[in-house]
A protein has these predicted regions:
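Basic, flexible linker segments flanking DNA-binding modules
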Residues: 1-30, 126, 180-188
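Hydrophobic (often cysteine-bearing) scaffold residues that line and stabilize catalytic clefts
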Residues: 14, 18, 32, 51, ...
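Mobile genetic element proteins and their domesticated derivatives, centered on retroelements
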Residues: 22, 38, 54, 60, ...
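An active-site-proximal beta-strand-loop segment
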Residues: 24, 28-63, 69-71
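Active-site beta-loop-alpha junctions of metal-dependent nucleic acid enzymes
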Residues: 66-88, 94
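C-terminal domain-tail junction helix/linker
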Residues: 106, 113-117, 139-191
């Protein structure tokens, strides 16, 4: 059982990068203002599993995620479509990512444009520009992945779903004034 840093830049035939609008300004005043997304890789039972996730920078909620045995466009598009459905198609949200080929692909860029989202990308090879989601990957792997053994892919998937539910609904954080991501989201929706 091993987690590995996934390098998504390798497919250079996919579109161009966009400006780093976020420029490490992770501050927010409300939900659906800034989202951050990335892909990470796990090795479980001799198979690679790719996890694409998207987080609201205000609530720190994992809004949506998808899994695949291959790092393809379906992985990314399933995740981003799920996020927009769940959050009721917010307009003007800044969506920040690294410069991975998925995020430079015309189908991803076209979807964001159709949804009136603003795309932002980290500088090439600079993980600190996407520190919010990178920090979550570290928490996920430290608190859950490295502490568990998985006797099957199914076991991994079930436990991952449970951990993300725990992270969103039960795990409070000092950054959120000791509230959970879901508490922050619902407080914001009422305000």
């Amino acid at each position: 059982v091993r987690a590995k840093k996934y390098n998504s830049y390798t497919n250079t035939g996919s579109g161009t990068s966009v400006k780093n609008i976020l420029n490490r300004d992770f501050s927010t005043s409300r939900i659906n203002q800034k989202w951050t997304t990335d892909v990470t890789e796990f090795k479980v039972c001799g198979r690679r599993i790719y996890l694409s996730g998207i987080m609201d920078m205000h609530s720190k909620e994992i809004i949506a995620y998808s899994l695949s045995f291959t790092p393809n466009m379906k992985l990314i598009m399933n995740m981003i479509k799920m996020a927009f459905r769940k959050m009721r198609n917010p307009k003007g949200v800044i969506i920040h990512s690294d410069q991975g080929w998925h995020y430079r692909h015309k189908s991803y860029k076209g979807f964001l444009k159709k949804k009136k989202a603003i795309q932002s990308m980290s500088r090439k090879g600079n993980c600190l520009d996407n520190a919010v989601i990178e920090n979550f990957w570290g928490i996920l792997k430290t608190e859950w992945f490295y502490l568990n053994k998985f006797d099957s892919i199914e076991s991994f998937l079930e436990q991952l779903e449970s951990y993300i539910h725990y992270f969103n609904y039960e795990r409070d954080s000092s950054v959120l004034c000791y509230r959970t991501p879901i508490e922050v989201r619902y407080t914001n929706m009422i305000a």
